Amino acid sequence: MLYDFVFNGWGMKFAANHDNLITRNLCHMKTFSDEVVPANMQPFVLEGGSIESDGKGTLMTTVECLASVNRNEYLQQEELERYLKDIFGLDRILWITSGYLAGDDTDSREDTIAYVRCEDEEDEHYEELKAMEEEIKEFTRANGEPYRLIPLPMADKVEWEGERLPATYANFLIMNGAVLVPFYDSPKDEIAKAALREAFSDREIIGINCLPLIKQHGSLHCVTMQYPEGFIE
């Protein structure tokens, strides 16, 4: 099943009309296997980077993104939860209410959460990310056991044309046999790489210079789309 949701330019910040045509155009071009059944899930707004699942019935998301008035204003949080559980076959949803930088990401193991920890009290993200850290410490797995938490360093400030860019090591990309981690020409790059090596001991950890990419306000995870094996013809 191939779900086609609405992408509205990260909460109507940018025009996204052409983006929303990609999935149906690929279907018309017969890009996908004949066994793939497309399903029109519009007008529900859901961007890929806003949800994370352990593949075991638990999904993690943020209130600020998914329940934003610029995305799904016609649905209350309880309605969002029922909808997500229904279409994805979920047992439960963990809602994060803190952390305005996209600095959290679950990895492929269902017992681990990798997240950004900010230790600089003068950093503008400190309070929000500290609150997020305390929040996820209270999360438990479906069996009641706590998650294994792996902190990633807060990336050094990256500025361009007078603006601070959303550099984060949590924007890593999991792929077959490897994990690509954003590098920002900082001593913290190797710290982040070592942390992810702890989380993914069975994969190669590869650093990618993302200073050019971050100028577009995103990184590795933001600019990629993963399809399950067998989807592409």
Placement of each model-derived feature along the sequence:
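The feature marks the mature, well-folded catalytic cores of soluble enzymes
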Residues: 1-233
